[in-house]
């Protein structure tokens, strides 16, 4: 028997009779529950059993037998090819990443502890809604305005400027009054710290008018607003709320924030309830609330597009040919499309809306990324959902379009959606590139980069070490061509040293070419490297072709929340080094100069 335990109760999720148990072969056994179709892996060795969910902890992919495994202990994820040694429950590619959650063994009973359904606390019976009482207006990307009786709530306001340094730009033109709507909001929910959801250019405009608007975020391990002080944006009413607890706004309106299982340090989602009617927004969560979500909500919205990563577009060497990239991207988008359709079908919301995927690599220097990084089409996803679950109403939003929830619930055939007037500009055609790129490039001439010892100071601050990886970082121009006199250096993270040549020992190696303006902006301000990687601002090659989860996870999510003390650094620079030095340093062999 496989059991699940909710709080202190258990229920059977998979039952194996004695014949089925006897027939388990040594090694890996794949099993599916006939009741709910959920999959499990049972590993048998010397008569002992181990079991886990057949679901990769990276992004939820399904495991299959690894044809390269000669010992019969390893399975491979069909999504990103991560590998799990089921005998140890350790991921072996990438190494040192996750530990798979093992189902506890007790004789032939295997038990899993799972999270309960917190939205069931203090249940509310749905009340009849009047026309116009609850409306949902799509503004752009992940930004929605909810009119909930007398209250206005806004999700993830990104209304101006780029995201991820200069890599992402808004695809849709927000309605002309979007900023005014934001300033009139009664409350704002920001799901996580990524800059397509937490947009400091947008919040800077908001703070000039409404610095005290209530903003709600989840209590993530890395604070959502960890960069607030450095941003110099003045917001005075940020509320960090615990997960899984109803937050009451008035007698009819409440909301609950839930965290993601895969990225609990930052990703969250939200349930909004008004007069017993639920709206579920899973945002970018890979596995929100451990996969347990409310069924039959009135409205569900989620991401859908894919393409929110530099992989594989920014990689070169080995298998990374253009044809391989195209095939990989096509397959990934198809898998994501099918996953979203299946998720929506399983949850059976009355209405579903795909959003949070309307971005474009608009800057001319990123034309290659724009052409290569194809994304899912919202209308195609909705068509797939309608085919498999015809009872679900779908909505493909346009900027300024309004969904009236009461009308939609009364009859899907009624005119519940009001689209923007004919002739409205749907797609952006101007982004003020120079304004934002020039701001990033101002870091190039910062005083700290006149002294090559900034490299050692920065990586000691970053705090990543005792990991067998050697990285070469190269500063480049817009086209990723190394800059004459630009910095080109090695970091050996095994002992956090800065050699002039690669070590003689056998070692994993990664070469990262970064646009100089973005890299120096990131270094100067102590920002996370998602600006480089998710923002398509670098180009990468690696030997061997292994994803180093610990390295990238550290630099994308675990850097210190307090930035480098560059004032202290400049005070420590010897006086004879304070005269102007080259902006970078490069040896004839391409190796970095020795740091002292």
Cite the ranges covered by each PLM segment:
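Short, aromatic/basic amphipathic alpha-helical patches
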Residues: 223-236, 368-372, 376-386, 551-552
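Feature captures hydrophobic
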Residues: 403-596
């Amino acid at each position: 028997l496989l059991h699940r335990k909710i709080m202190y109760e258990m229920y059977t999720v998979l039952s194996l009779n004695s014949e089925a148990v006897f027939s388990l072969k040594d090694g890996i056994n794949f099993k599916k529950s006939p009741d709910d179709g959920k999959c499990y892996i049972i590993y048998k060795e010397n008569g002992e059993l181990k079991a886990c969910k057949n679901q990769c902890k990276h992004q939820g992919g399904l495991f299959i037998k690894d044809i390269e495994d000669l010992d019969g202990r390893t399975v491979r994820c069909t999504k990103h090819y991560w590998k799990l040694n089921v005998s140890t429950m350790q991921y072996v590619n990438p190494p040192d990443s996750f530990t798979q959650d093992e189902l506890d063994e007790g004789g032939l009973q295997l038990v899993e502890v799972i999270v309960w359904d917190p939205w069931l606390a203090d249940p509310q019976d749905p009340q009849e809604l009047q026309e116009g009482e609850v409306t949902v207006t799509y503004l752009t990307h992940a930004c929605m305005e909810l009119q909930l009786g007398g209250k206005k709530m806004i999700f993830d306001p990104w209304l101006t400027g780029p995201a991820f340094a200069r890599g992402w730009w808004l695809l849709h033109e927000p309605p002309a009054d979007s900023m005014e709507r934001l300033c009139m909001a009664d409350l704002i929910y920001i799901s996580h710290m990524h800059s397509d959801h937490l947009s400091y250019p947008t919040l800077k405009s908001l703070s000039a008018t409404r610095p005290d608007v209530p903003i709600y975020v989840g209590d993530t391990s890395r604070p959502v607003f960890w960069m607030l002080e450095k941003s110099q944006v003045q917001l005075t009413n940020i509320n960090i709320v615990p997960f899984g607890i109803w937050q009451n706004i008035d007698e009819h309106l409440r909301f609950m924030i839930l965290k993601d299982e895969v990225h609990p340090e930052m990703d969250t989602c939200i349930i909004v309830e008004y007069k017993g009617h639920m709206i579920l927004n899973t945002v970018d969560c890979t596995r929100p609330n451990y996969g347990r979500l409310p069924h039959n909500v009135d409205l569900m919205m989620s991401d859908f597009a894919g393409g929110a990563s530099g992989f594989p577009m920014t990689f070169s060497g080995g298998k990374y040919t253009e044809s391989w990239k195209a095939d990989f991207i096509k397959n990934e988008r198809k898998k994501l499309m099918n996953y979203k359709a299946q998720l929506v079908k399983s949850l059976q919301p009355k209405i579903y809306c795909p959003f949070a995927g309307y971005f474009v690599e608009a800057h001319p220097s990123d034309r290659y990324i724009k052409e290569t990084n194809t994304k899912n089409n919202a209308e195609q996803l909705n068509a797939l959902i309608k085919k498999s679950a015809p009872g679900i109403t779908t909505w493909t939003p346009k900027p300024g379009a309004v969904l009236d929830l009461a009308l939609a619930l009364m009859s899907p055939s009624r005119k519940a959606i009001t689209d923007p007037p004919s002739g409205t500009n749907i797609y952006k055609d101007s982004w003020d590139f120079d304004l934002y790129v020039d701001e990033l490039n101002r870091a190039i001439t910062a005083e700290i980069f006149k002294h090559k010892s900034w490299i050692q100071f920065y990586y000691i601050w970053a705090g990543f070490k005792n990991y067998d990886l050697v990285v070469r970082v190269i500063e480049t121009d817009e086209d990723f061509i190394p800059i004459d006199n630009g910095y080109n250096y090695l970091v050996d993270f095994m002992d956090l040293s800065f050699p002039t040549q690669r070590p003689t020992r056998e070692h994993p190696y990664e070469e990262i070419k970064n646009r100089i303006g973005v890299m120096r902006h990131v270094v100067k301000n102590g920002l996370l490297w998602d600006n480089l990687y998710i923002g398509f601002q670098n180009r990468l090659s690696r030997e061997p072709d292994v994803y180093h989860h610990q390295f990238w996870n550290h630099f994308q999510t675990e850097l210190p929340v307090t930035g480098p003390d560059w004032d202290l650094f400049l005070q420590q620079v010897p006086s004879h080094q304070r005269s102007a030095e080259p902006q970078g340093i490069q040896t004839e062999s391409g190796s970095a100069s020795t740091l002292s």
